Design a protein with these regions (language model features):
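N-terminal pre-Walker A segment at the start of P-loop NTPase domains
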Residues: 7-29
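Conserved lysine of the Walker
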Residues: 52
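Flexible phosphate/Mg2+-sensing switch loops adjacent to catalytic phosphate-binding sites
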Residues: 62-89
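Mid-core helix/loop region of P-loop NTP-binding domains shared across ATPases and GTPases
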Residues: 114-157, 161, 183-187
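Structural recognition of the conserved hydrophobic beta-strand(s) that form the central parallel beta-sheet
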Residues: 156, 193-199
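Substrate-engagement module of ASCE P-loop NTPases
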Residues: 175-192
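Short regulatory helix/loop adjacent to the ATP-binding pocket of P-loop NTPases
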Residues: 203-217
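Conserved small/polar residues in nucleotide/adenosyl-binding loops
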Residues: 238-247
Length: 251
């Protein structure tokens, strides 16, 4: 179990053990259906505090091959779905929060280098017996691992768009970042699922053509993910009543 490669289920377990936890595991049934298809690229955009990071941690806990999450998920919605056992803890998961790397660097070049070095440090340790064409290049190294070990990856990127908020007027920095994401994710056989979260949809940043492989699920157009990202009226009502919220606030 690593920090970025197969981070395990500790983070999700902490969420489940909290005073308030809303079951959103039905999202996994959707991601299971689109794994290794043309719909495998998912970008969810919501304002802060809408459970985006929780969902990212949940997916990492479910797919990561470095842990056993069967008991953890057994009491939730996904356990009753036909797809529950299909991919449970059967994938290499790379999970990163872009804000973490951005806050440690003073320019976009350094941020990308730090991200690559951090993930590669774990990958090269786990797959030390692979012949690498260039073990300083993340995309090439993942391709080498896939070709020699037949181990595909699921990539989860939380706060993918923080760069656009930090470098609002720096078009060169934005383009470098988008070029990195495209070369890392687009048309790569080693990727079986890519799940990104952000505040605004990709198209709002004027980069939709560069990342046009993503299906976007926003506040305006949530599609089949509506009840899994955010809170429906029924769920809000149930939890407000359960925590003895005054009646005039519940209504």
């Amino acid at each position: 179990m690593g920090v970025y490669l197969n981070p395990g289920n500790d983070s999700f377990r902490k969420m489940v053990n909290s005073d308030i936890y809303v079951d959103k595991t039905g999202l996994i049934d959707y991601t299971n259906k689109v794994i290794n298809t043309m719909q495998q690229y998912i970008c969810v955009s919501r304002p802060r505090r809408f459970g985006k990071s929780m969902a990212a941690g949940m997916l990492a806990a479910y797919y990561s091959s470095a842990c056993d999450s069967s008991e953890l998920f057994s009491k939730f919605e996904i356990a009753h779905c036909e797809s529950f056992d299909r991919y449970l803890n059967k994938y290499n998961v790379i999970s990163v929060n872009m804000q973490e790397f951005l806050s440690q660097c003073t320019c976009i070049d350094d941020m990308i280098k730090l991200l690559e070095r951090s993930v590669l440090w774990e990958l090269l340790d786990v797959y030390s017996d692979v012949r690498y064409f260039d073990n300083t290049n993340l995309a090439r190294s993942m391709q080498d691992i896939y070709m020699q070990k037949k181990c595909p990856f699921i990539v989860i990127i939380d706060e993918w768009d923080c760069i656009f908020r930090e470098y609002k007027t720096d078009k060169a920095a934005q383009e470098k970042y988008i070029d990195f994401l495209r070369s890392f994710l687009k048309d790569k056989v080693y990727i079986h699922l890519a799940y990104m979260t952000g505040i605004l949809p990709i198209k709002k940043y004027g980069t939709h053509s560069a990342l046009n492989m993503f299906d976007e699920f926003s506040m305006i157009d949530p599609g089949p993910l509506a009840k899994y990202v955010g809170f429906t009226g029924a769920v809000s009502y149930t939890h407000l009543r359960a925590h003895e919220t005054p009646e005039h606030l519940v209504c």
